Amino acid sequence: MKKLILVIALIANMGVVGAQQVSSRAKAVLMMSHVRPEYMIKDVKIYTDTMTIYTLADMVVYPFGKWENMDKYITATQLLWSRDIGYKRYFDSMEVAVNTLRRLDGSYIDMYYGIHTGLVEMLDGKITDTNIVLNNGLHAGMSKQDVFNVYFKQFPKSYVNDIHVLKVISGANEVGQIYTFKGTKLRHIGIISRYKYY
């Protein structure tokens, strides 16, 4: 009899816990209902500890704003950068002339001049320096809540507690920003690109 009561209590407890847990897809759907319109977010996906946002906004391609050349960007940031110029091959593309800006802490940004856009385009990067601020105000060292508040209006905080990586991907899936959290702080921002240069 005691075993039967114990089994019934265990099953009832599992049912309550299961009902309290919200599936990843349900979380993603709820988060979609709270997106900020200026980011033109078209989809949100959650897989284990990673949330991926797909957006049509050009802020993913131009996270530091739209610049006609590197010198204007360097002057505007008022930060001390070391600058390397060279050629790099990305994926199966031809080699491209790349400007690499570096900070003393190891942060770097690879950029190139887009001949079709006439603007500086992002290729690669890792930002850990808290002084490097994206156009939308994001920077390393911010709280997780502040980062999510940039992309979403009010939402259940419990939905992002277990998120350790936030990926913001351009609609064409060519450029992305990867925000990696350690605890409740933004540890670093990564920039990835799958551009084809032709």
Regions found by a protein language model. Give the residues of each.
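Short helix/turn-capping signatures at newly exposed starts of structured segments
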Residues: 18-160, 182-198
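Positively charged n-region of N-terminal signal peptides that target proteins for export
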Residues: 1-4, 20
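Short, exposed beta-strand-loop hairpins at the edges of beta-sheets
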Residues: 168-171, 175-187
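Sec-dependent N-terminal signal peptides
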Residues: 4-13
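A cross-kingdom feature marking solvent-exposed beta-strand/loop segments within repeated
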Residues: 162-165
